[in-house]
Amino acid sequence: MWPRSHRHLCLAFLLVCVLSAISFLIHFHQDSIRHGLGLSVLCPDRRLVTPPVAIFCLPGTPMSPNTSSPCPQHPASLSGTWTIYPDGRFGNQMGQYATLLALAQLNGRRAFILPAMHAALAPVFRITLPVLAPEVDSRTPWQELRLHDWMSEEYADLGDPFLKLSGFPCSWTFFHHLREQIRSEFTLHDHLREEAQSVLRRLRLGRSGARPRTFVGVHVRRGDYLQVMPQRWKGVVANSAYLREAMDWFRARHEAPVFVVTSNGMEWCRENIDASKGDVMFAGDGQEASPWKDFALLAQCNHTIMTIGTFGFWAAYLAGGDTVYLANFTLPDSEFLKIFKPEAAFLPEWVGINADLSPLWPLAEP
């Protein structure tokens, strides 16, 4: 049994240790919040993390020998916390992701995505931006900025350290200088790429049975656009004449191409696209709730025919090669042209074919 004086000394020592530990944790937590970090998990082993969480690795954190990939780290020169509100469908959120990444880098800020965007994109792509935990999102003193769909000078000098972007940006003018990084972010998971390539390998040209030498992805946007374009935007969707002209453009320039058609209106495609030459394959499943299968097919092709919409844009951007797009698809007085600049939407080297606006002529009459 220790003397009473020794027991008092031990108790005092333990009390000092406990108070020191509590003080350290309080200051550590306050510092992390002050710098915009939601530290749900500290590495080393990222595989133990179940998204959505905000992950940030402290400098010099040792890595587990079994770690399959490094924890996402922001350069020390970056500060603040930026994110973007996930809105719209698959292609919209790809545009929001790419724009957030590019603008945050340009302004020296850390970029985080919200859980809904992670849920939409992570099952398809090897994206690397960390996810902001909901509790961090809710207590962050955000400034908000709605983006228009083209790069502007003011976007290169945004001073807010805690910024939540919104809107539907999908213009190459935001991120084309980072094209290889963007393409890397949107790398398909292996099983999706392999499944798409397996479908393409099985395709044969109808008349000869030969393997095609060139794959041209064709995305035909229909669905809600059939009403939205004429009724709201004084615009049209692609018709069969446009698709025929676009396919002929590729037939004149590439030997033995095969056209891999995907759409959210596959029945219309089968009824209106001429497949008599044996080089048109209706390969899409048209499931809007699970668009990644069609997207993977398009992204694995060599070239692209797109109609309208961000889904087709991203398929073309990732596929590379030649792209033909539907041009001038609204009347000149369309309100759509206030939020959409064709020169900022389509890469300069892409080839536009004018839409048939005759169905809209009654709308143009005084």
UniProtKB/Swiss-Prot annotation:
Subcellular location: Golgi apparatus, Golgi stack membrane
Gene Ontology molecular function terms on file: alpha-(1,2)-fucosyltransferase activity; galactoside 2-alpha-L-fucosyltransferase activity
Lumenal-facing ranges: 26-366
Protein's gene: FUT1
Role this protein plays: Catalyzes the transfer of L-fucose, from a guanosine diphosphate-beta-L-fucose, to the terminal galactose residue of glycoconjugates through an alpha(1,2) linkage leading to H antigen synthesis that is an intermediate substrate in the synthesis of ABO blood group antigens. H antigen is essential for maturation of the glomerular layer of the main olfactory bulb, in cell migration and early cell-cell contacts during tumor associated angiogenesis. Preferentially fucosylates soluble lactose and to a lesser extent fucosylates glycolipids gangliosides GA1 and GM1a.
Family: Belongs to the glycosyltransferase 11 family.
Leading EC class: transferase
InterPro entries (UniProt xref): Glyco_trans_11
EC number: 2.4.1.69, 2.4.1.344
Chain positions carrying an annotated carbohydrate: 66, 302, 328
Protein name (Swiss-Prot/TrEMBL): Galactoside alpha-(1,2)-fucosyltransferase 1
Bilayer topology: Single-pass type II membrane protein
Cytoplasmic side: 1-8
Highest rank taxon of the organism: Eukaryota
Pathway: Protein modification; protein glycosylation
Annotated GO CC locations: Golgi cisterna membrane
Transmembrane regions listed in the UniProt entry: 9-25
GO biological process, one term: regulation of endothelial cell proliferation
Catalytic activity: a beta-D-galactosyl-(1->4)-N-acetyl-beta-D-glucosaminyl derivative + GDP-beta-L-fucose = an alpha-L-Fuc-(1->2)-beta-D-Gal-(1->4)-beta-D-GlcNAc derivative + GDP + H(+); a ganglioside GA1 + GDP-beta-L-fucose = a ganglioside Fuc-GA1 + GDP + H(+); a beta-D-Gal-(1->3)-beta-D-GlcNAc-(1->3)-beta-D-Gal-(1->4)-beta-D-Glc-(1<->1')-Cer(d18:1(4E)) + GDP-beta-L-fucose = alpha-L-fucosyl-(1->2)- beta-D-galactosyl-(1->3)-N-acetyl-beta-D-glucosaminyl-(1->3)-beta-D-galactosyl-(1->4)-beta-D-glucosyl-(1<->1')-N-acylsphing-4-enine + GDP + H(+); a neolactoside nLc4Cer(d18:1(4E)) + GDP-beta-L-fucose = a neolactoside IV(2)-alpha-Fuc-nLc4Cer(d18:1(4E)) + GDP + H(+)
Keywords (A to Z) from UniProt: Glycoprotein, Glycosyltransferase, Golgi apparatus, Lipid metabolism, Membrane, Signal-anchor, Transferase, Transmembrane, Transmembrane helix
CDD domains: Fut1_Fut2_like
